[in-house]
Amino acid sequence: MPAPTDHQLFDLGDLPLQSGATLRGAQLAYKTHGSLNADRSNVIVHPTWFSAWHDANEWSIGPGLACDPEKYFIVVPNQLNNGLSSSPSTTPPPFDGPHFPPITFHDQVEAQHRLLTQQWGIESVELVLGSSMGAGQTYQWAVSHPEMVKRAAPIVGSSRTSEHNQVFLKSLRATLTLDPAFRGGEYSPDARPTAGMRAFARIYAGWGLSQAFYWEREYRSMGYSSLEDFLVGFWEGFWLDDDRDPNNLLAMLWTWEHGDVGRTPGFDGDTEAALRSIRCPLVAMPARTDLYFPPEDEQWASQFIPQGEVRVIDTIWGHFGGLGMNAADNAFVDRTLQELLDRPV
């Protein structure tokens, strides 16, 4: 599926990064749903997940849903590195391709904060929500701008990337970069590391969905006739898309791997202290069978958040239980979001 084109670009100008580099002429791609009201008090922020573009969030946006564009002004910022916002594939030298500087969740949120405050003069946000890497950005919003965020809902994500999760991410990086066609990230557009990307897809297939999903052969409900049909048609088909640039994927992997709200300036690596600083009600929604972000990760974090709560998505769809793939899981997420939005703050 090609990258969407129904977005706008916000000029960030020069964006200082936590690495010490400055991303000059940076741009943030975004899409909005609904209208901003007169006092700018109806804002929802919904960041994107790994490899996803803004359209991947649209399952949770619509009339009658919690994220209702008839009530709210919903901003969906594309994270840096995803190919629409400033990324290795879109940036000229000296930060082109493999030379693109590392981006943290803090950097992502500061870019989004510029968009909200400079483009629309927004001072408060009713809800920040996001899935997977979007959940990491949600936690970061609540820590970086507690005066601004009224509610937060991280879905199938975490406040700190666990070492077990890092093992998965390192395996993806290794398999992609070991393809001879990768050439240290200086690959030709006409000779992309497709062998590495096929292996990347096969590794992802074993982590993104649960053991029970495969035991029940749930892929048949998606229209695939066999395991091999699913691996080729769904997984390889997704990752071999021409618009999914390998350097962009590696840059997003770095952000994911180094996710930790404790790295927010002022907390000196103390994740627990960063979580204690969150002022708003925060309802985390891990999936029971998620191999990346198991419920235990969120239960650990929740004990430090003054108004923290965990609602587990009871699903066999693993990580995909929070990505809009299954109607029952979507309904659970939407009900939980509605309850959170109805809560006085």
Predicted regions and their residues:
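Short alpha-helix in the alpha/beta-hydrolase fold that links the catalytic acid
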Residues: 264-271, 280, 291-303
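Alpha/beta-hydrolase-fold enzymes
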Residues: 154-239
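Short beta-strand/loop motif that positions the catalytic acidic residue
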Residues: 278, 284-286
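Catalytic-loop region of hydrolases
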Residues: 1-43
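Conserved hydrolase catalytic core segment
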Residues: 123-168
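N-terminal cap/lid subdomain of alpha/beta-hydrolase-fold enzymes
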Residues: 31-93
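Catalytic active-site module of serine/aspartate enzymes centered on a nucleophile-bearing elbow/loop
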Residues: 299-303, 307-345
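Conserved acidic catalytic loop of the alpha/beta-hydrolase fold
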Residues: 95, 99, 106-126, 140, ...
